[in-house]
């Protein structure tokens, strides 16, 4: 089941990393680790980290988690930069629009899931870009700002 979930989350772009917390010495856990190594070799972008609850030093487990998180963070950052390049928006564009629309800053605001995007920030950027494209008042305001000559 663990292997299937890992494949599902990776193929459907639902996360950047899977961390499996397992009891030490559990036979099904040991078997799934063997299968998981084969699966990870097939899906090159998959980040999978098995951690056993005992038998492994706390410092060792902590450093392994930190390394895997750094990989996942880099993957999420690259995905976000790709979304910005694809939409043609800048961070300042997104921040300005969000500042003018306080509902987007609510903690419980539901951002719709976009297929092929795993990261929350990238999902939000795609969503705000779609809102900006549909917002006539915003488009009109941005055209007026571009039409004004800049005085030195």
What are the residue ranges of the model-derived segments?
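An N-terminal assembly and electron-transfer interface module characteristic of large anaerobic redox
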Residues: 1-152
